[in-house]
């Protein structure tokens, strides 16, 4: 008990004043129970403050920068956690699972960004879910991204690791096949797939018939641009843009067309295949404003 009291006073100088005001340290206490009660209340105050400060810090993302050993020593690893604690066991699991998915293709990758988050359950409405998002920055093949939700954080890490491994293997196989058939290759004789030309009416029809996103109750939702990103946009062929769209696992992809130099938008059609939006004669056509009902949806952005 004496050791605990000394430690508590050393950690929180305010406790010294509190004890001094209520206890005469130079004299023997006449009421032992009163002394014990005063000391307990003072120490409890200090402990409550410490716990509160830890809870506040957990609301901020924990960012850890690491690197693997051995063949992966050249690959930078960034691990972030939001609304959860990144324990040593979780960090070791990420290093093991994500590391194994990247190990055989480490020459293609320069940086791995892993983001772990929690929602639902005690944190918010809805079922308890754990999300793992992995973004790979490759040396010559753009960005590869995958994300998965699961009840267990470890399960979400395992699922994403498998997806990343498949995507890297696909890139490696393509590079190998490309090198194997490069002899006698003439790029000018290779035609990119002809894009499907769509009309304005077709675009509006797809937008209006698209399923509405799941809405949530959020009175504090602000309908404005809350984040802006800047990207390098090197010229790509349509085939290369399709590959990038699959790698980032998004529904659309904006790119600079290698042939025309214009910004095009490639997107997945709900009937299957891809659609391509191209400026008409190098100039965008201004569309009339249409009343669109805004559905509030959850955001997992930073």
Curated annotation (Swiss-Prot):
GO biological process entries? negative regulation of translational elongation
Q: What is its main location?
A: plastid
GO cellular component terms?
A: chloroplast stroma; cytosolic small ribosomal subunit
> Which Pfam families does this chain map to?
Ribosom_S30AE_C (PF16321), Ribosomal_S30AE (PF02482)
Recite the UniProt keywords alphabetically. Chloroplast, Plastid, RNA-binding, rRNA-binding, Transit peptide, Translation regulation
- Keyword RNA-binding assigned: yes
Gene Ontology MF terms = ribosomal small subunit binding; rRNA binding
Transit peptide boundaries, per UniProt?
1-66
Q: From what superkingdom does this record's organism come?
A: Eukaryota
Compartments where found: Plastid, Chloroplast stroma
Is Transit peptide tagged as a keyword? yes
**What family does the database annotate?**
Belongs to the HPF/YfiA ribosome-associated protein family. Long plastid HPF subfamily.
How does it associate, per the subunit comment? Binds to the mRNA channel of the chloroplast small ribosomal subunit and interacts with 16S sRNA nucleotides at the A-site and P-site.
* HAMAP family the UniProt entry points to: HPF (MF_00839)
Tell me, what does this protein do in biology? Ribosome-binding factor involved in light- and temperature-dependent control of protein synthesis. Interacts with 16S sRNA nucleotides at the A-site and P-site, where it protects the decoding center and inhibits translation by preventing tRNA binding. Stabilizes 70S ribosomes against dissociation. May be recycled by the combined action of ribosome-recycling factor (RRF) and EF-G.
Protein name (database record):
Ribosome-binding factor PSRP1, chloroplastic
Q: Specify the species.
A: Spinacia oleracea (Spinach)
